[in-house]
């Protein structure tokens, strides 16, 4: 089948989880050849949709059609650490048969296993090399590889099968800059139908179209992420104009209805006066009264219907406006004076991971990006600075109050409400003060009383961020470990907004260069056994 014939079709899908939570109802989607980026808020059903298309889940209603061999790279990989590379690639049996034939064993069974794949080892090594894995060979085990290498290996297995349809679910989450570059190259070279769920801006700039999943349906936008954002901004500006016009119409209809009531009341008083003074025959006045009542009723109904229609148009206009509120906070307690000493590192050796040579003194409100290949020790270093780990040797001396946002958002007590979680980190604040500040993080009213365990991914992130930033004492050194890994685009934007208000020093371990640039990084460091200065350009190139 040629690449131009590949496609995915979902017709009238309905899917709910066993607890009754509805994900899709009457859902339709068609994806043709080319690269499609699927975006949407955390929890809207993106990963569920990919699992439905892959056949891992079954819809309660509807039909899914896939033309072309299908490959699926899920967000979470479950690989046995004892598996060898050739087993993950699915070529171990053919390698064994090739070895047997080369050793002189010419039984028919070996030829049946090999089929036409006499060059399978060469093709496998070439595929690995194309993804930057040429160094691992075919006999290494999963347990000897990093998380990023495992993701690329699983992608290599899919590419080796030459599928016509490829599903990728947050493929860059655990990849370092070098591995991301290799994955971007694979996406650029793709010719079949590709559907990728991602919040990675660089990856989404490479797609041909954007499918925006929102409230159980998809809206299509031609072009990459930048084109989508431009089109959405135009749409939202038009929607806001429609709302303002509809609001104006509602107010006008209310005024006209009120004026009509006043006019009818005056006519009623005049008619009663005519009746009381008997200026005309009773029969004539009775006819006029009945006609006036009919006319008044019609007039009232007409204006009431016009008001109802105007209110309906307002509801429709408001439904087109996205309620993407911004985080607007002030954090004066986090201020660090220029030149003030914040952190001293000297040849730190964390209790796990590689040791690091070199010295670092953080002064003032520096914003430092911590980069390096997977396994270079970024997480171990941050945990050591935060006090979660004790250094085996060297000096690790935070000189100000420190806050740490780990990769896993396990800072919150799931059984406690959002407001109680924040109150625990700021024991000197009143309940009203905590609630007022939480509102700036978009937890207003009853939302602040929800148990942390019931929050969506984006909500949980905001609550965790609030717990850290609203702490007493306020953190004047903030450590973030891959903060954008599990966030949708809206949550990444809100993190950026919150960090705009942060006035302390910042150390961020991340491979997400666009995010790092958006938060105003002032110094780029690379870990490779030493603490080395680098540049954004070098990090973007995978260096």
Locations of regions flagged by a protein language model:
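ABC-family P-loop ATPase nucleotide-binding domains
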Residues: 79-147, 407-477, 482
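Coupling and communication elements adjacent to P-loop NTPase active sites across diverse families
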Residues: 1-16, 94-151, 234-352
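Catalytic Walker B motif of ABC-type/P-loop ATPase nucleotide-binding domains
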Residues: 166-170, 175, 405, 477-482, ...
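Hydrophobic anchor residue at the start of the ABC signature
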Residues: 155, 183, 465
